[in-house]
Regions:
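Transmembrane alpha-helices and membrane-interface helical segments
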Residues: 41-48, 115-122, 232-236, 283-287, ...
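Membrane-interfacial loop-to-transmembrane alpha-helix junctions, especially the N-terminal start
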Residues: 6-15, 56-69, 153-156, 242-250, ...
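Intrinsically disordered, polar/acidic, low-complexity terminal segments
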Residues: 142-193, 197, 203, 207-230, ...
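Membrane-embedded helix bundles of polyisoprenyl
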Residues: 246-265, 272-282, 299-303
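Signature aromatic-anchored transmembrane alpha helix within multi-pass, membrane-resident enzymes
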Residues: 65-66, 72, 476-499
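Membrane-interface transmembrane helices that cradle and orient dolichyl/undecaprenyl
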Residues: 280-296, 328-333
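Transmembrane catalytic cores of multi-pass membrane glycosyltransferases
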Residues: 19-21, 29, 33-36, 75-97, ...
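Start-transfer (signal-anchor) and selected internal transmembrane alpha helices
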Residues: 7-15, 57-69, 104-165
Length: 623
């Protein structure tokens, strides 16, 4: 008997899917218009979906997945409220209905969150079930092959434990990294400005509310758990088995302990969502052997999750696709099979990027980074210039020994790939070289293409993923031990550096507290503070790095870029601690007033700072 194309459950999924789209769209006209187009396409796709009524009912009936979807939708509903509460268009709609906007928007958010639960739950249920089915099959194949090693569950615990030990010095430092200070003081999120709506939603779940309380070290430990899961999944995807050797676990630690990701895990608030962007780039590849629609959809959702959590990870998925395509070709897969895999991956990638660009991304242009592209004629030269700048930074960041180990790890990847290939030697060498070049160009994602990009270490953790791919390939199996050594050595030096970096943060924190207390102590002697009248205090200059760290950059140039400015003028992030953490009486922080151009008399001058002031104005010049 022929299955009916339409049945009530499909209609429910259509309406629920549209509700989910409305829950995610930001308050801007272009996004809302494209959201309507996406809703029509979604309904057509669900209509044509070749699935039975019984299958849909089974997917909808799992209570755990339904609860998970409701929790996630609830976090999105909080986003929806903040996005639309000040919208004039929403206020007009509320007025037409005779309601106050303060009541109408929460009702809409709650309605869309509940209405979107069936669609979200159905998708979650399908992919969890498919993943479990593939895992059971891979586990059975691993047992039949006689492969021995550390099971996935135990491997995950080991990798997580190693990662947490690796960042223990960072956790012990209790360092407020860059915008951690204002977030801890004010509890704000404000990732929406960079269209990182998923980070905002997940933060609501992690912190148990809309106000971000300082829950460190929980977010950082959660970040390392996510990175450990990402590493194990990468090994599972590439090796196609459920057991791992000690060599393989050692090189997988590079993923979370490379110096560039240490710049991410230093954040007390942002760390889990930076780590989640890596996981979102890896998970779609679990379904690469599923039907085309399922793989393209999960790839699109994964890239959308990357772009709405931390866009620096946008190059990880295509980089892994290229590496997997090389493995497929080397193992004898036809050009057609490899090409089809790449095309499906590219389709999913484009789907996610297009939805993000047309519906979600609100143009941003700041001194930090923008999302505009240069002109078409300048795009490729601009990309190559920025790419060269990224690799120049890596060369200066890495010690000579690190550079040697990284080059040897890349060479081991190439040698292992060619030796294990079922193809002829020359074509294998050529394809490996092409793959190496492509992965090197992709590891920084879309950032090299941006007209105004960012070169901070936290934006470069894709290079750590590239090193992990090198090491994972070289360390695979039980043979050719010499090829495993460079990546294992690299994992060890990164492990050691994580302690050095954490201790350096602790030293910088102590020095910052010392210098801040000196300024406050001297300000107490200023006559302007002997009354209750407000006094405008401005900071200029910077304390720089702690003296004990001055010699370290000769050995670890990476520290120069990882340790931020902590106390000084000209940057809000270096002033929040001074103005907000010490309950300074009568002190006014007024960024609109610049005292540096005034010829204020010197009130105090010592080896650490100069204090100038007159009347209700005080300028602190840090040395």
């Amino acid at each position: 008997m022929k299955e009916k194309r339409f049945f009530p459950e499909k209609g429910l999924l259509m309406l629920s899917g549209v509700a989910f789209l409305l829950l995610t769209v930001p308050a801007w006209v272009q996004g809302f218009v494209w959201c309507g187009v996406a809703a029509v396409l979604l309904c057509v796709a669900v209509w044509r979906l070749p699935v039975s009524q019984q299958k849909v009912r089974a997917l909808l009936s799992n209570p755990a997945h339904a609860a998970l979807s409701l929790a996630f939708n609830g976090a999105l509903a909080v986003n929806f409220y903040h996005i639309w509460i000040d919208s004039q268009k929403m206020q007009r709609v509320a007025g037409w209905l005779g309601m106050e906007n303060g009541l109408f928007v929460p009702l809409c958010a709650a309605f869309f969150a509940i209405a979107a639960a069936p669609a979200a739950g159905c998708v979650i249920s399908y992919y969890i079930s498919a993943g479990q089915e593939d895992y059971r099959r891979t586990k059975a194949e691993t047992l039949r092959s006689g492969e021995t090693g550390i099971p996935m569950g135990k491997a995950l615990l080991i990798l997580f434990a190693v990662s947490v030990v690796g960042i223990s010095a960072i956790l012990r430092a209790n360092f407020y990294y860059m915008d951690d200070s204002p977030r801890a003081a004010l509890g704000y999120k404000q990732w929406d400005y960079f269209s990182r709506y998923l980070s905002t939603a997940l933060a609501t779940l992690v912190h148990g509310g809309d106000y971000l309380v300082d829950a460190a070290p929980l977010p950082q430990m959660l970040a390392m758990l996510i990175m450990a899961v990402s590493g194990i999944l990468m090994g599972y995807i590439f090796c196609e088995r459920t057991t791992f050797s000690g060599w393989e676990l050692a090189v997988l630690s590079i993923l979370g302990l490379n110096p560039y990701f240490l710049g991410c895990v230093s954040f007390r608030f942002d760390a889990p969502y930076m780590a989640f962007s890596v996981l979102a780039a890896v998970v779609p590849l679990l379904y690469r052997n599923r039907n085309t629609a399922a793989y393209v959809l999960v790839s699109g959702l994964g890239i959308l999750a990357v772009c709405t959590s931390y866009q620096a990870a946008a190059g990880i998925f295509p980089m892994l696709v290229v590496a997997l395509a090389l493995r497929m070709w080397n193992r004898g897969k036809s050009i057609r099979e490899v090409g089809l895999f790449c095309l499906k991956s590219a389709a999913g990638y484009a789907l996610g990027l297009l939805f993000f660009k047309l519906v979600i991304m609100i143009p941003a242009d700041t001194n930090y980074v923008g999302n505009a592209l240069p002109s078409a004629g300048e795009l490729i030269p601009h990309f190559m210039r920025n790419l060269r700048s990224y690799y120049s930074l890596i060369l200066s960041d890495f010690k000579p020994f690190w550079r040697i180990a990284a080059v040897l790890a890349a060479a081991a990847f190439c040698i292992r790939t060619v030796l294990d290939s079922r193809r002829r030697t020359l074509p294998a060498i050529a394809m490996t070289a092409v793959t190496l070049i492509l992965m090197g160009m992709m590891c920084f994602g879309l950032y090299p293409a941006l007209a105004s990009t960012v070169f901070a270490p936290r934006a470069m953790y894709g290079f750590g993923v590239l090193l992990t791919v090198f090491g994972m390939t070289a360390a695979e199996g039980k043979t050719r031990v010499p090829l495993k050594i460079p990546a294992v050595v690299l994992s060890w030096v990164f492990f050691v550096f994580s302690f050095t970096y954490g201790n350096a943060l602790s030293v910088q924190k102590d020095y910052t507290d010392f210098r801040t207390q000196l300024v406050i102590s001297d300000l107490q002697e200023v006559e302007a503070f002997r009354s209750d009248a407000p006094v405008t205090v401005q900071l200029s200059g910077s304390i720089g790095k702690a003296p004990v760290l001055w010699n370290m950059p000769q050995n670890y140039q990476m520290l120069n870029r990882l340790i931020p400015d902590t106390f000084g003028g000209g940057d809000d992030l270096t002033q929040y601690g001074f103005y907000c953490y010490y309950d300074l009486q009568n002190v006014v922080w007024n960024p609109d007033v610049d005292l540096r151009g005034m010829d204020l008399p010197v009130l105090e001058d010592n080896m650490y700072h100069t204090i100038r002031g007159e009347g209700s104005y005080v300028l602190v010049e840090l040395k």
